[in-house]
């Protein structure tokens, strides 16, 4: 297979839905977007199985997965909303948090599928796709919750899972900047987004 013909499976594992499509090496979309609801609570085994089935059904030769939690050196540090009983806004399951901690999902999925798989934080993955490659860049993702990535001259820098961090009014950033808050009161949501960006810029800019 020529490099230009290679099909890469791109997976965006979000708090409420899992989206995937085949793309070329150059980023051209090659297939319709597939979408399914995110299972909750979600164990590491469920995560691996869902991605494995998708790889098998597409015949992709490589896979990139955006993970909705904090990762360090390829291992899971924080689970985001995956270890919650029913998704965002529901209680965490401590035992499931521990089962996630330290998992090398790239290695596990590569072993399960027989193809090269890379799993990184979803905001970091977005940054790699849209970063300009120079200066200090702050990339913020907004959806069900929020994520943050920092790049300096095109290189990813360590960044926390800001979605779980508390806000001054007693919420966390996932709650304050997520889609539910936007749908409830967009004026307040816009103000909250502006204040969050100003705060993060003062820290990372």
Predicted segments — roles?
Residues 2-49, 91, 155-183:
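Short glycine-rich, Thr/Ser-proximal phosphate-binding strand/loop in the N-terminal lobe
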Residues 8-12, 62-64, 137-141, 147:
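Short glycine-aspartate micro-motif
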Residues 18, 99-123, 155-195:
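Glycine-rich phosphate-binding loop plus the immediately following alpha-helix
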Residues 18-22, 69, 146-152:
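Short beta-strand scaffold segments in enzyme catalytic cores
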Residues 44-52, 62, 71-130, 176:
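Glycine-rich phosphate-binding loop and adjoining helix at the ATP-binding site
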Residues 45-58, 191-197:
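Short, well-ordered amphipathic alpha-helical segments that serve as non-catalytic structural scaffolds
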Residues 60, 196-205:
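Proline-aspartate-enriched helix->loop->beta-strand connector
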Residues 117, 123-159:
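Hydrophobic, well-structured mid-protein blocks that either form specific transmembrane helices
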